[in-house]
A protein has these predicted regions:
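Metallo-beta-lactamase
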Residues: 1-22, 38-49, 110-156
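Catalytic core of the metallo-beta-lactamase
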Residues: 17-25, 30-39, 135-158
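Pre-active-site segment of Zn-dependent metallo-hydrolases
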Residues: 27-32, 39-82, 94-103, 107-111, ...
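Conserved phosphate-coordination/catalytic loops
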Residues: 61-64, 87, 150-153
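Histidine-centered divalent metal-coordination motifs
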Residues: 79, 83-90, 151
Length: 158
């Protein structure tokens, strides 16, 4: 699992018109995929997945990304872009939406169908926007263009 460097307390100030990319999980491990992109005081989240525990984690069902960096900034989040429907990319969405339920979820038809089913179990009704290959969307300060990618699950986008 990834752990923060003990000497780092907070990131340096972001330059004017700068972009900061903050991985909150998924580095050095297979799972907990979650990346935050910061620009102009706004945040875009890409994926929000779980990590399945190994044998040396008895009694633990799921391991979530570390939400601490964004917990106090949930009002700055423009959207959560979901690249595909694997649990290591969507499994933590219900836990993040407990902090702020009205964050838009952006993804392909299959990906959103999978997360909507998961959110029904948690009694969360999401706001969603279905996107397709080649589509461009303005998500607050972020201009996004979606591209189809090959993966072991259909309807994956980058």
């Amino acid at each position: 699992m990834s752990h923060p460097h003990p000497e780092l307390t907070s990131p340096p100030p972001l330059a004017t018109n700068g972009v900061r990319v903050i991985p909150l999980g998924g580095l050095g491990e297979v799972g907990r995929n979650m990346t935050v992109i910061e620009h102009a005081g706004r945040l875009l989240i890409v994926d929000c997945g779980v990590l399945f525990p190994e044998d040396h984690h008895p009694g633990i069902d799921l391991i979530l990304p570390d939400f601490e960096y964004i917990e106090d900034r949930m009002d700055d989040v423009e959207a959560i872009v979901l690249t595909h429907g694997h649990e290591d990319h969507i499994g933590a969405v219900p836990f993040l939406l407990r902090l702020k339920a009205d964050i838009p979820l952006i993804g392909s038809t299959l990906t959103l169908a999978m997360i909507e089913a998961k959110l029904r179990e948690h009694k969360i009704k999401p706001y969603t926007l279905t996107v397709t290959e080649g589509q461009r969307e303005k998500l607050g300060v972020f201009d996004c263009e979606f591209a189809a990618v090959n993966h072991s699950i259909p309807d994956a986008l980058a």
